């Protein structure tokens, strides 16, 4: 039986690149790229990606087990499915990326970088996702991009909705609620993420899922992600999810991107600040020549603080809380 992760890590294509089981047909489309189509009728086309950052191993392990169970017949496929391991060379080396962050390159932004394996990979991933959705005759398009965060978080499991000018899918929102996410963050401007690309270019209901902290293979406690794992299994098999057991999600929207625009950029407490740390109005957060930032709202929460990014890139995002009723959902 095809071992999706092992073959991808080997750097060699499988000897057999397509086949079928009792329940589905599968096809290897390239390194870390696999389609699975059920024999039965279906109404959804779903993309699940992991490993855009090579050191984020928990989502890779979760996705690989999902593929293994589908191919073994332990889980019955009910959707048209594309699974992607985003950056195989970085996965092999246990690195976030080798030259540049792929998750800033989508939407054609890779063309502004020095050509590399990662710019070419971003282009390939875009082409495969567009071709997958364009060949679909289904009414529903979904994309979940699985990640883990660099540092700890007051909300260990959270989602990021890409900015879009149309309302978000109510069905996606219900699924995100039922997989026990602690928080949901709404972007308020366009970006170079994979989820933003599939939302903007392919009109997919898309979300980036952050599952805990980045750890090496074999060191993940996957039990803490059991609700999300079950959610993915439920999604691809079209089975019901149990009702949410934990307290309700918290909701945030982005109000400020903190850009590192000078070599002397400083970010307050950056080395030990965890995601969703709260700061009061007036707190000085960043310093750089001619551009300091103080918290403007009564309270703001920081996400993805990283003062070591390259010049011109985002060193963090500031959030404010919002109510569920403020989310644009249809």
From Swiss-Prot:
Keywords: Arginine metabolism, Hydrolase, Metal-binding, Zinc. It is an enzyme of class 3 (hydrolase). Its EC number is 3.5.1.96. It catalyses: N-succinyl-L-glutamate + H2O = L-glutamate + succinate. Transmembrane segments: none annotated. Its cofactor is Zn(2+). InterPro entries: AspA/AstE_fam, AstE_AspA_cat, Aste_AspA_hybrid_dom, SuccinylGlu_desuccinylase. Zn(2+) binds at residues 53, 56, 147. Belongs to the AspA/AstE family. Succinylglutamate desuccinylase subfamily. PANTHER family: ASPARTOACYLASE, SUCCINYLGLUTAMATE DESUCCINYLASE. This is Succinylglutamate desuccinylase. It comes from Yersinia pseudotuberculosis serotype O:3 (strain YPIII). The gene is astE.
